[in-house]
C-alpha cells in the first residue's frame, strides 16, 4: 500500500536521485532505516524502475529536437515488428509513441543539427517503408520534465 510518505519519497527521488537517504528520511519524518526499507520496497514493487543521469544536450552536442510524424500504411504484425526494431536501433530516436488520429507514430529525435535529420531519415528508410512522414523542428523547449506526478497512486 502506497501512502503519503511513499509518494513524497518518490517525488524527492525524481527531483534528485542522488539525495542522501538521511535527507530524504528527514524530509518525510522517518528514521534512516525505515526510509531505506521504504525505498527498497518501492524498488522491489517496481515503482522505481532505475536511476539515470540526465545529460545536458547542448554540452553533448545534441541541441536540436525534431518530431517526426509517421503514417505506416501497413499494420501487420511483421511490419510493426520491423518498424519497432528499426526505430529502436537508432540512438538518436529517443522516444517513440503510437498515436490515434491521422498518424500512427510520433518520434522524438535528438540531433546535433537540422542537417543530420537527413541521415536519420535515410537510416529509417533502409529498414522500413512509410506511407507518409512529416518532420517538425522544435524552436523552443517550453517544458521538459522526467518527473511524474505521484498523486495518482
From Swiss-Prot:
Instruction: Name the Gene3D superfamilies on file.
Output: 3.30.70.920, Winged helix-like DNA-binding domain superfamily/Winged helix DNA-binding domain (1.10.10.10)
User: Which SUPFAM superfamilies does the entry mention?
Assistant: Dimeric alpha+beta barrel (SSF54909), Winged helix' DNA-binding domain (SSF46785)
Keyword DNA-binding assigned to the entry: answer is yes
Tell me the domain of life. Answer: Bacteria
The identity of this protein, by name, is HTH-type transcriptional regulator Zrp
Task: Report the CDD domains cross-referenced here.
Answer: HTH_ARSR
Instruction: Mention one GO biological process in which this protein takes part, according to its record.
Output: response to amino acid
Q: Which Pfam families match?
A: AsnC_trans_reg (PF01037), HTH_24 (PF13412)
One Gene Ontology cellular component annotation?
cytosol
Species per Swiss-Prot/TrEMBL record:
Zymomonas mobilis subsp. mobilis (strain ATCC 31821 / ZM4 / CP4)
Task: Show the coiled coil region(s).
Answer: none
* HTH asnC-type domain span: 2-63
From the Swiss-Prot or TrEMBL record, what is one GO molecular function term? sequence-specific DNA binding
Keywords for this entry? Answer: DNA-binding, Transcription, Transcription regulation
Known DNA-binding region: 21-40
Q: Which gene encodes it?
A: zrp
Amino acid at each position: 500500500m502506497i501512502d503519503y510518505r511513499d509518494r513524497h519519497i518518490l517525488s524527492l527521488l525524481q527531483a534528485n536521485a542522488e539525495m542522501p537517504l538521511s535527507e530524504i528520511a528527514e524530509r518525510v519524518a522517518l528514521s534512516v532505516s525505515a526510509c531505506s526499507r521504504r525505498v527498497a520496497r518501492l524498488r522491489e514493487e517496481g515503482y522505481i524502475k532505475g536511476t539515470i543521469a540526465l545529460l545536458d544536450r547542448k554540452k553533448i552536442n545534441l541541441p536540436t529536437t525534431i518530431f517526426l510524424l509517421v503514417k505506416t500504411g501497413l499494420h501487420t504484425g511483421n511490419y510493426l515488428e520491423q518498424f519497432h526494431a528499426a526505430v529502436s536501433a537508432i540512438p538518436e530516436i529517443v522516444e517513440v509513441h503510437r498515436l490515434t488520429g491521422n498518424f500512427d507514430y510520433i518520434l522524438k529525435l535528438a540531433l546535433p543539427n537540422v542537417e543530420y535529420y537527413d541521415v536519420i531519415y535515410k537510416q529509417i528508410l533502409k529498414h522500413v517503408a512509410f506511407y507518409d512522414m512529416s518532420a517538425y523542428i522544435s524552436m523552443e523547449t517550453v517544458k521538459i520534465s522526467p518527473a511524474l506526478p505521484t498523486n495518482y497512486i
